[in-house]
């Protein structure tokens, strides 16, 4: 039996109908699935741990992160914690440095589930990067995770997701892209 876990950013992704075509296709294929949509726009470690706990109970073979960068980043952390429940977040998270010079070796991913990223906006590129940003709700610190193990196994970029997005989301995504471009010009690698 194949099982899939759909990670959506907030209930608005589900309420906007983005999950329906995917859920319909999974039903049509006879794939048992569930949806975890308790992901805030600025995902917290607590939310990621709750998602990983739900995944552990459901035991999916495939994790589908649908939404913007928040859903994909949260999905990556959930995937990491689902695959490696003993992994220590404090070891994985650190101020950003060259991804090739990390002092922590991430555990191998993909033993339990494939990770598929489907963006609904074009702001972060998280669907094709080995990075995730997650906020430690206890300290308020946003921590970057950087390792090639966090690369999704597959990215499905459907332009219909962006073309049907509300104008406000499209504007915010454009500003997000510009912010990332400016930030990278000031980053010392």
Q: What does each model-found stretch correspond to?
A:
Residues 9-10, 14, 39, 166-169:
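A short N-terminal beta->alpha junction/helix N-cap motif
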Residues 1, 25, 164-167:
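A generic structural signal for short coil/turn motifs at secondary-structure boundaries
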Residues 17-90:
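N-terminal small/polar loop signature for handling phosphorylated ligands or for N-terminal nucleophile
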Residues 85-186:
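A glycine/threonine-rich phosphate-anchoring loop and its flanking beta-alpha core
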Residues 10, 68, 120:
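Glycine-rich His-Gly loop
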Residues 1-8, 13, 188:
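Single conserved hydrophobic/aromatic residue that forms the stacking wall/gate
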């Amino acid at each position: 039996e194949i099982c899939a876990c759909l990670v959506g950013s907030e209930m608005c992704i589900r309420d906007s109908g983005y999950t329906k075509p995917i859920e319909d296709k999974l039903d049509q294929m006879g794939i048992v699935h569930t949806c975890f949509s308790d992901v805030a726009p600025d995902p917290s470690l607590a939310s990621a741990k709750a998602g990983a706990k739900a995944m552990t109970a459901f035991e999916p073979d495939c994790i589908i992160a649908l939404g913007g960068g928040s859903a994909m980043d949260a999905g990556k952390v959930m995937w990491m914690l689902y695959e490696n429940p003993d992994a220590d977040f404090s070891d994985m998270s650190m101020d950003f440095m060259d991804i090739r010079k990390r002092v922590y070796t991430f555990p191998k991913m993909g033993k339990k589930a494939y990770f598929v990223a489907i963006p609904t906006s074009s702001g972060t590129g998280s669907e094709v990067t080995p990075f995730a940003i997650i906020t430690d709700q206890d300290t308020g610190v946003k921590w970057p995770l950087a390792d090639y193990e966090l690369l999704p196994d597959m990215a499905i970029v459907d332009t219909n997701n962006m073309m049907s997005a509300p104008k406000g989301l499209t504007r915010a995504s454009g500003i997000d892209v510009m912010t990332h471009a400016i930030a990278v010009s000031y980053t010392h690698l």
